[in-house]
Amino acid sequence: MPEEKLRKLDMVRETIRELRNLGIRGTLYSVVITRVGPWTLSYIKYDDGTIGCGCANNEAEREEIPDDVSFIKDLLNLNTYEVVDRLESFGDSVFINSLRTSIASALSYKLMNDVSLLKKEGYDAETFIAPNLPLFDPSKFVQPSDIVAMVGFHMTVTPLCADIAKEVLVTELMDLKELSVIELGVREKSNVKIFPADKSKEILSRADVVYITGETVVNGTIDEILEFSKNARTRIIYGSTSAFYPKVLFERGVDVSLPMIFPNTPDFRRRFVLSRGNWYFMRDVKQLLIRRSRT
């Protein structure tokens, strides 16, 4: 694979190497793919028989899921690291990246599902249960004088940040027309401004706090975003797509990880499938607040 493409997912590849070095082993057990959401949900079976699960956005609304994903059947029940090696031959599409990332999160499940293990690794880590999620409490990170940049508009978090911050600047890959609001008569004053993604360098370089969607991991923009935002006081990555062991994230410059952790139960998998991936209000979903070690 060309070097420039390898660079895209170095973060996930390095994370998988870290997990391998930690002695974490398992086989690919099951994969669920949805076009709504859209999500790739992977399950691995650890060598001790317990199950780990991990999810990643596959951006099906912008990049089509392959018509034929039957090749994944040939990967089931294989050693997870053999699966990852075989995926190298399938290119570096967003879908393949989402599969690789979801596998990395599934491999990370034992570490991420037990904050005591993360604390042993030297991280500050807390667990939160909906609706009391740290993602929905920007006062933990944002001050009234701050300029907040958000990589990706979030329908809940963007206005919450706007209630506190001096200014909220959003960069988006989607057509900005889709985020426009038509106001007739009374117009709301707003400290939120939305820009196309090609303005990212200009916007992120001004920010005190940066919220980064985990989707940037699968679309290959995460390293560029971290470079553009290197002057920020706090950089936060959030969501189910960034639910993997955070060592490499922190080494690259992320300060806070807010991953969503799904239950590994058959009941959750069934509800996920029947709802076509609408996990947002499902019971037993939790969020971690992990801060990188300052030592």
PLM region descriptions:
Residues 234-295:
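C-terminal functional extensions of proteins
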Residues 194-205:
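Short acidic low-complexity segments
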